[in-house]
Amino acid sequence: MASQGTKRSYEQMETDGERQNATEIRASVGKMIDGIGRFYIQMCTELKLSDYEGRLIQNSLTIERMVLSAFDERRNRYLEEHPSAGKDPKKTGGPIYKRVGGRWMRELVLYDKEEIRRIWRQANNGDDATRGLTHMMIWHSNLNDTTYQRTRALVRTGMDPRMCSLMQGSTLPRRSGAAGAAVKGIGTMVMELIRMIKRGINDRNFWRGENGRKTRSAYERMCNILKGKFQTAAQRAMMDQVRESRNPGNAEIEDLIFSARSALILRGSVAHKSCLPACVYGPAVSSGYDFEKEGYSLVGIDPFKLLQNSQVYSLIRPNENPAHKSQLVWMACHSAAFEDLRLLSFIRGTKVSPRGKLSTRGVQIASNENMDNMESSTLELRSRYWAIRTRSGGNTNQQRASAGQISVQPTFSVQRNLPFEKSTVMAAFTGNTEGRTSDMRAEIIRLMEGAKPEEVSFRGRGVFELSDEKATNPIVPSFDMSNEGSYFFGDNAEEYDN
């Protein structure tokens, strides 16, 4: 990793701390988890939820969304200035599911945002605890990444649906700060920039005046974040070009799409964190576990240990498979939507299947769905091994990948070769190497052609037994390379709709 020294670790981003040592970081992340847990316990009390109802992931999502909406200042301001019929800008709520007379009932609750903010601050020692809020946003984002394939969004910005492995964090709100930026994939950053450039093309005042100055600095900041994710000089030089453009337009969009495509082989570094639902933290805190005292890390064994000892339930629709629902949530918990399925199967200890083979829809239940035949079941979120999360893209090499998704973005730092469909990717690079970025383009193509199938990423890194907390004995897995490695293989996952 170039410039490793200048980058803050993500625990530092997570804790807005300058230079902290490992113990301080662990305590600081633990404190954030404690706050989420305490808030969740208090909300379950307010809503009079039984222990079982409090461990229902659908209730967790509603409670998380309520607090995120209560702190969404921009949207709150917008709602007050543009009142819409039947929507009280000062209130927030959602569906809460309760067990009544042997069946599940939906109850719509409504709370004052002010009241929710008070409960949240109280659980966080009077602080706004933005990091805890961001943590929940990342959990929602990881769940979206596992549940939906962003085909439409990719096509709309002129990218190819097969590039879905670059789309981590594409549903994260803009206000998710540095920790949010760290987990966004290359494609997500490119898409945000393209949307911005398109607005500038259609609206001549977009880059002008007082507002235009702010817009411009946001544009340059996003370019720099994207540049920092690339690992080769040529890709970074290309980002400098895009950033310095006087009047960003179609040439820049071309360059951005080119660089996104190149990231299928010359992968960028994207952070991964295991962010769990609030209904996991709540019961742990109420059982007396002190996260701040014990310390916690989002990228080590801690989330695995926590999930080994947690009971989480989910509502199951009549024709859904509970094991498939469990896989979906397990992948989301570990931010593993774009990881190689063979590695995931090894770590989890049960076969992890591509999205299109899962008989399950999303975790959330729409307000018009019939509750009569809803069952609930335990989510199996335990694992056989654990592994360290990575924030590098691994080095780049080649192996046959699938029709749907043609590359992976590694989540775990474990030795393997990373699959991608070289011929498919390279086919997109014929022709257009003229223009001002021609030398960079030529260099990027040269690097991609040099990528070798035999090359191993994360050499010597392995998975660990759950009893091996200090990560002393790496177990390097061996894979059956004939198996399918991509999750969104020629896929029919539903679209994500806001």
Swiss-Prot record:
GO terms for molecular function: RNA binding; structural molecule activity. Residues 1-21 are annotated as: Disordered. Its main location: virion. It comes from the Viruses. Late in virus-infected cells, may be cleaved from a 56-kDa protein to a 53-kDa protein by a cellular caspase. This cleavage might be a marker for the onset of apoptosis in infected cells or have a specific function in virus host interaction. Keywords: Capsid protein, Helical capsid protein, Host nucleus, Host-virus interaction, Ribonucleoprotein, RNA-binding, Viral nucleoprotein, Viral penetration into host nucleus, Virion, Virus entry into host cell. A motif (Unconventional nuclear localization signal) lies at residues 1-18. Residues 8-21 have a biased composition (Basic and acidic residues). Encapsidates the negative strand viral RNA, protecting it from nucleases. The encapsidated genomic RNA is termed the ribonucleoprotein (RNP) and serves as template for transcription and replication. The RNP needs to be localized in the host nucleus to start an infectious cycle, but is too large to diffuse through the nuclear pore complex. NP comprises at least 2 nuclear localization signals that are responsible for the active RNP import into the nucleus through cellular importin alpha/beta pathway. This is Nucleoprotein.
